[in-house]
């Protein structure tokens, strides 16, 4: 199962008591703030959840799988996410209890 933005908004509606429009706007604003921070080069640290960071990947050699021809893969900037130890621990604990 995948959790979508629409489902997050529904959860805010059900559990927090926001109306559907407010819940949808809150979810959209949350992700917009993360996007804006990353676009400006800032990291996003969500305590107890994890960190979003930008990482520069240098140019590297690649290969066309059809022809075998070597082609350069251009340098680029990527977004990475690292889950916090707290989040990892909670997920591991949930699965350990579920299996045991």
Swiss-Prot record:
Coiled-coil regions listed in the entry: none
Pfam families in the cross-refs: Bac_DNA_binding
Family: Belongs to the bacterial histone-like protein family.
Keywords: DNA recombination, DNA-binding, Transcription, Transcription regulation, Translation regulation
Organism of origin: Chromobacterium violaceum (strain ATCC 12472 / DSM 30191 / JCM 1249 / CCUG 213 / NBRC 12614 / NCIMB 9131 / NCTC 9757 / MK)
PANTHER family, per database record: DNA-BINDING PROTEIN HU (PTHR33175), INTEGRATION HOST FACTOR SUBUNIT ALPHA (PTHR33175:SF2)
Gene3D superfamilies: IHF-like DNA-binding proteins
GO-annotated molecular function: DNA binding; structural constituent of chromatin
InterPro entries named in the record: Hist_DNA-bd, Histone-like_DNA-bd_CS, IHF-like_DNA-bd_dom_sf, IHF_alpha
Stated name of the protein: Integration host factor subunit alpha
GO BP: DNA recombination; positive regulation of metabolic process; regulation of DNA-templated transcription; regulation of translation
Subunit organization: Heterodimer of an alpha and a beta chain.
